Amino acid sequence: MQDLRLMLLLFGVITIIVLFLHGVWARRKERSALFYDQKTKDQNQKEDDVLLQILDEEGVGEVKILKKAPPNVEKNAFDKAHHKKIPSQTKYQALKFDSSVACVTASSFAQISETETQLQKKSDDLSHQSKETHHPSIQKEQKVLVLHVAAHSSRNFSGETLLKSILNSHFQFGDMNIFHRYLTLTGERITLFSLANMVKPGFFDLKKMAHFSTPGISIFMTLPCYGHASENFKLMLQSAQKIADELGGLVLDDQRQMITPQKLEDYNALIRSTPHL
């Protein structure tokens, strides 16, 4: 019995010593961690101070966010739009041709020829309306620039596909049942150029486009015209090329030949020789 008490006493003393030593070790570990954290913070602060000093020496100050100034609103929007050029690319798009494929069949040429006079008449009517609306006192000789977009030999453009491409090129269905590219100024629409069916009678019936097909279309503009004729023609050429690319067709000149750089220069020469409105 005496031996058991002695063993329990000895065990208690050993336990107390172990707990004491563990407490001392834990306290030292905590102090070491606190010291390390403080040392790290001091080091980081020192690095930040050095970086700020370097920035000051280099002349780099605090970053400031500048608010964009609100745009000035023109009092006379019509005057601004009148002098504003129609957006277009500075260079003509590269025209893609397939010289191994015939442009249009002979029968298509016969149909196309029947509409040449009608196109001229439509163009004259449109320019006459525009002249009466905007420049009633100016009487000048009318000239017409024409581009054709034709399907490859023995092929036709389907009506639905053609209509989608025409609308994608920002044409709108309007007067004389053909499409027009408009410039809108203060609620007033001005025709820049127009698009008609290449074959007789030249107009479109939107209700029958699903069952309609054609070997090609004609895009035309009159001279003199509103604004800058050269910019209008660039836009017309880009529209013709876009439709041709989407439909797999060809861009032809007014003689229904493959358009060439020389022909484009002839068009531009005609534009330069025409007085402005």
Curated annotation (Swiss-Prot):
An annotated GO BP:
division septum assembly
| Cytoplasmic face of the membrane | 27-277
Can you name a GO cellular component term?
A: plasma membrane
User: Does the UniProt entry include the keyword Cytoplasm?
Assistant: no
| Annotated localization | Cell inner membrane
Q: Which residues does the annotated region (Disordered) include? A: 120-139
Keywords, in A-Z order: Cell cycle, Cell division, Cell inner membrane, Cell membrane, Membrane, Transmembrane, Transmembrane helix
The residue spans the entry assigns to the Periplasmic side of the membrane are as follows 1-5
- Looking at the record's lineage, which domain of life comes first? Bacteria
Q: What is the topology of this protein in the membrane according to its UniProt annotation?
A: Single-pass type I membrane protein
Its quaternary structure?
Interacts with FtsZ via their C-terminal domains.
Q: What does this protein do?
A: Essential cell division protein that stabilizes the FtsZ protofilaments by cross-linking them and that serves as a cytoplasmic membrane anchor for the Z ring. Also required for the recruitment to the septal ring of downstream cell division proteins.
Similarity-based family: Belongs to the ZipA family.
Please report the name of this protein according to its UniProt entry: Cell division protein ZipA
